[in-house]
A protein has these predicted regions:
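Oligomerization/assembly interface segments of phage tail-like spikes and tubes
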Residues: 31-51, 86-98, 243, 293-308, ...
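Short beta-strand and beta-hairpin "edge-sheet" elements
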Residues: 65-93, 322-352
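A broad structural signal for short, well-ordered beta-strand segments within beta-sheet-rich domains
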Residues: 22-28, 78, 155-160, 222-227, ...
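Acidic, small/polar-enriched beta strand-loop surface segments
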Residues: 3-8, 113, 197-346, 360-368
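Charged- and aromatic-enriched interaction segments used to assemble
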Residues: 93-232
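Beta-strand-rich assembly/attachment modules of structural machines
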Residues: 1-120
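A general structural signal for short secondary-structure junctions and capping/turn motifs
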Residues: 33, 81-82, 189-193, 231-235, ...
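A broad, structure-centric signal for solvent-exposed, well-ordered loop/edge residues
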Residues: 36-38, 52, 85-88, 99, ...
Length: 368
């Protein structure tokens, strides 16, 4: 299997849209996507290049793209350029990072709020619409029209965004996707049909992004090329889970899932106010206990390009069966891809670093 290698790196003025470079010579290039985050890009440039034309990668004012096989595979904003020995180190993050530099100066996202029982996807779109409605603030980002049943705000606790709030728009957007049974998002970039313009997209998923993959796998001795750390952490371990659901005070629903297994009793509490039935709350508590009782997890692996999981075959949010066997121990199980970084110039050939979380940690739409 031949790994796709970047054919070129392009940069563009963020305000005027003028192309600054259609073949920027970036070395040590690394780039990738992230679940519910912007993902990142890093690399180095020759100092003489930037000294002769600083606008090629002007921090905070430049879009940067990676093209492979004639298709854009990553895009974002250059945020940092600094000297590093005899080179310039460049760092960028994808589209949602822009909201970390914007605030709700008008309140209620320019009059689009407040919100009661509002679809979180709708509020997320309102945040982007507001941010891009201000002069010099339009990235051209399109947010999916996905809808969900995950809501925010109640008559007793209306969701507001005040003009004096010091939390940036990025923090408000993150809050909408940070809980259990909330929508997912990731940033994507592509050419339009005739390759005359860039499509910048916030891809929304409900009840989730990604799917369980039976056609690819990550395995030691097959495509995992380094011995990953198998973490045995007691901080997350619990054989007793207390789940709180809808309601307030003494009327708040509560279910406990507990077993005795010869180990020191450890408890964990979770809050799931979106669950208003004891049966669903009990199922949620049992699912939570299920993954917390498993000692051992793999948070990151490095793979090479093989038929077992060709580069580009997985999507952010996918569940992939993972097998790790080394002298320290073994781990097998379904893991969710929460991010990946492609290193096309890695020593020995292209590599991808995959960030993982146990699939059993996640609950989608209130159902595990």
């Amino acid at each position: 299997v031949s790994a796709p290698t970047p054919s070129r790196v392009l940069t563009q003025n963020a305000v005027t849209g003028a192309w600054l470079s259609t073949a920027l010579p970036v070395c040590q290039l690394e780039y990738g996507d992230e679940l519910n985050g912007p993902g990142s890009l890093s690399g180095t440039l020759a100092p003489r290049l930037l000294s002769s034309n600083p606008a090629l990668a002007d921090p905070g004012n430049t879009f940067i793209y990676v093209e492979s096989g004639g298709q854009l595979v990553w895009g974002g904003i250059v945020w940092d350029v600094r000297t590093q020995g005899s080179e310039y180190a460049i760092e960028a993050a994808s589209w949602s990072s822009y909201l970390q530099r914007r605030y709700d100066l008008d309140g209620e996202f320019g009059g689009r709020g407040p919100y009661t029982y509002a679809d979180r996807c709708h509020v997320l779109r309102d945040i982007w619409t507001y941010a891009q409605s201000i002069a010099d603030g339009d990235l051209g980002v399109v947010v999916d029209s996905t809808t969900s049943t995950s809501t925010i705000g109640t008559p007793a606790d209306v969701y507001h965004s005040y003009s004096y709030d010091v939390n940036c728009l990025g923090d408000k957007a993150d809050d909408l996707v940070s809980g259990d049974a909330t929508p997912d998002y990731t940033c994507t970039t592509a050419w339009n049909a005739d390759k005359t313009a860039v499509v910048k997209r916030i891809r929304l998923g409900w009840p989730r992004l990604g799917r369980r993959r039976t056609d690819i796998s990550f395995s030691s001795g097959v495509n995992i090329i380094e011995d990953p750390e198998i973490a045995l952490g007691g901080d997350d371990y619990a054989q007793v889970v207390i789940a709180s659901g809808a309601g307030d005070g003494s009327a708040k629903l509560r279910q406990i899932s507990a077993v005795r297994n010869g180990r020191l009793r450890l408890e964990a509490a979770i809050d799931a106010p979106e669950l208003n039935g004891n049966d669903t709350l009990k199922a949620r508590a049992e699912a939570e206990r299920g993954w917390r009782q498993v000692l051992g997890s793999v948070d990151q692996i490095t793979i090479r390009n093989t038929t077992a999981a060709p580069f580009g075959s997985w999507q952010t949010g996918d569940d992939v069966y993972t097998r790790v066997h080394n002298q320290w121990g073994s781990f097998t199980g379904w893991c969710r891809v929460t991010g990946s970084t492609v290193k096309p110039e890695a020593q020995g050939g292209p590599q991808a670093v995959i960030s993982l979380k146990p699939s059993s940690m996640y609950n989608y739409g209130g159902v595990s």
